């Protein structure tokens, strides 16, 4: 993400969940998980979470403390379309598949900017992570912003292929870090599809890892553990590169 003048808060708010209202998107709040023992002098990696079909920003942010209670600031975004009531009685949302990349990217950028105004976020350690349909959104944005993010995670999702063609530009894909966690019994997006996506991204030059899990479209408990380890490796690899280590 680009640098900007930041004046984040210097106190130490408690670990927990917070809500931010964006003036630019009043109907689409941003939920934040702040880690334990937040240190305002430390630039935290930021993980942006996109929920699955019928989910919500509250529901997907529950992954944050399972990912790590110390390592990251996490935010979650709300899809633009209501799709009924969830089993917990709350409204579920979805992401429109086509022709909304500009709007979603604008929403993301405003959410990241507001988070960076409030908390100390490392500008070069922003990761996108999506679940199910949200993984498709993360892919779309990552392909457009490959040079502005540190990497992306897709859990039980698929690379969007409108008209049978990928959305990415080969010139921007080289070196993009991608973690794919996928259930081998997933019938919504099959594991065979995940393998094809892996080969597609690998051939385009992405630094991609595909990890299978014994689950369906439901998230496996080990996914967040592996996500945490993958993000930390990605951060350390970039640090070593900057320091000239091999």
Sequence positions of predicted segments:
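Serine-hydrolase catalytic machinery in alpha/beta-hydrolase-like enzymes
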Residues: 5-121
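Loop/turn elements at helix/coil->beta-strand transitions in domains of secreted/extracellular proteins
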Residues: 44-45, 70-72, 123-125, 147-151, ...
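Short, well-ordered alpha-helices that flank and scaffold nucleotide-derived cofactor binding pockets
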Residues: 65, 143-147, 196-199, 203
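The feature captures the conserved acid-bearing segment of alpha/beta-hydrolase catalytic domains
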Residues: 157-233
């Amino acid at each position: 993400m680009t640098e900007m003048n930041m004046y984040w808060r210097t106190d130490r708010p408690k670990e927990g969940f917070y809500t931010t209202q964006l003036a630019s998107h009043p109907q689409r709040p941003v939920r934040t998980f702040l880690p334990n023992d937040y240190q305002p002098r430390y630039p935290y990696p930021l993980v942006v979470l996109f929920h699955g079909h019928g989910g919500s920003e509250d529901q997907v942010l529950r992954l944050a403390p399972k990912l790590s209670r110390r390592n990251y600031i996490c935010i979650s975004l709300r899809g633009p379309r209501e799709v009924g009531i969830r089993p917990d009685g709350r409204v579920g949302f979805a992401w429109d598949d086509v022709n909304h990349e500009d709007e979603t990217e604008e929403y993301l950028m405003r959410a990241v900017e507001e988070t960076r105004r409030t908390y100390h976020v490392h500008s070069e350690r922003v990761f996108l992570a999506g679940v199910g349909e949200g993984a498709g959104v993360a892919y779309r944005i990552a392909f457009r912003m490959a040079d502005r993010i540190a990497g992306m995670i897709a859990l039980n999702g698929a690379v969007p292929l409108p008209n049978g063609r990928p959305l990415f530009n080969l010139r921007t894909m080289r070196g993009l870090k991608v973690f794919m966690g996928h259930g081998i019994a997933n019938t919504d997006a099959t594991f065979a599809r995940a393998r094809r996506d892996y080969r597609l991204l690998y051939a385009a030059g992405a630094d991609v890892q595909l990890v299978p899990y014994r689950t369906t479209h439901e998230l496996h408990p080990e996914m967040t553990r592996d996500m945490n380890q993958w993000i930390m490796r990605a951060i350390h690899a970039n640090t070593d590169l900057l320091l000239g280590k091999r």
